[in-house]
Curated annotation (Swiss-Prot):
This is Uncharacterized protein in gldA 3'region. Signal peptide: none annotated. It comes from Geobacillus stearothermophilus (Bacillus stearothermophilus). Transmembrane segments: none annotated. GO terms for molecular function: 4 iron, 4 sulfur cluster binding; epoxyqueuosine reductase activity; metal ion binding. [4Fe-4S] cluster 1 binds at residues 27, 30, 33, 86. Residues 18-47 form the 4Fe-4S ferredoxin-type domain. [4Fe-4S] cluster 2 binds at residues 37, 79, 82. PROSITE patterns: 4FE4S_FER_1 (PS00198), 4FE4S_FER_2 (PS51379). The keyword Iron applies. Keywords: 4Fe-4S, Iron, Iron-sulfur, Metal-binding. NCBIfam families: tRNA epoxyqueuosine(34) reductase QueG (TIGR00276). Pfam families: Fer4_16, HEAT_2.
Length: 216
């Protein structure tokens, strides 16, 4: 009736219910979701390699592997590609509960304001949604990657500030990588200056990546 657009949940009760009938596997020879997955996380037989899944990757707190940064694109949290392409979901009306409909400004927020949002502002604006449970750092990291995806040069001053001043290595390093993706020779000295003072080895590695991209 609803395709795969359902919330999964559990309720503990002592009421005896008759078991449901198993759902029929209607995939057959269809491989659309397998072929459409940006990172190849889906394999034959309905198996999922969660460590490749964008829905998983966007929730991690560390540096994202290089091979997935471009594939994540502009996603801040989660990924629905497999659901969007599934023939079983075509024509399904899952807009049943208006109170569950996402606010466009929350579901697709502007990227640059996320870079400097405070903990309090983040909790007030996003604290009620599932994407906030890991805190603001993964969302900010993903916003930096999204800005690099768009090659938004107007974000360079914000990214440079993060690279020099943010206390979190993940944010400093990802910002340095993004500067390398977006910028040109005019910002090379900012990366070189950051490299001289940086103490964290992982961040240094990201700065070097940024420098190499600008020199390529």
């Amino acid at each position: 009736e609803f395709g795969s657009y359902v919330y999964l949940g559990e309720m503990i009760t002592n009421i005896p219910f008759p078991p449901d009938s198993p759902i029929e596997d209607r995939c057959g020879s269809c491989n659309i979701c397998v072929d459409s997955c940006p990172t190849g996380a889906l394999v034959q037989g309905g198996q999922l390699d969660s460590k490749k899944c964008i829905a998983f990757l966007t929730q991690t707190k560390g540096f994202l592997p290089d091979e997935y940064r471009g594939k994540i694109g502009n996603r801040l949290y989660g990924c629905d590609t497999c659901q969007l392409v599934c023939p079983e979901n075509k024509g399904k009306d899952f807009h049943i509960h208006s109170e569950m409909e996402p606010d466009p400004e929350i579901a697709k927020p502007k990227l640059k304001p996320l870079l400097h949002i405070s903990n309090r502002e983040f909790k007030e604006k996003f604290g009620h949604i599932a994407g906030s449970w890991r805190g603001k750092k993964p969302i900010q990291r993903n916003a930096i990657i999204a800005l690099a995806h768009y090659k938004d040069r107007t974000a360079l001053p914000d990214l440079i500030k993060l690279m020099h001043e943010d206390s979190r290595p993940i944010i400093r390093g990802t910002a340095a990588w993004a500067i390398g993706r977006i910028g040109d020779q005019s910002v090379l000295f900012e990366l070189e200056k950051a490299l001289e003072k940086e103490q964290d080895e992982e961040v240094k590695n990201e700065i070097v990546k940024g420098i190499e991209m600008l020199k390529a």
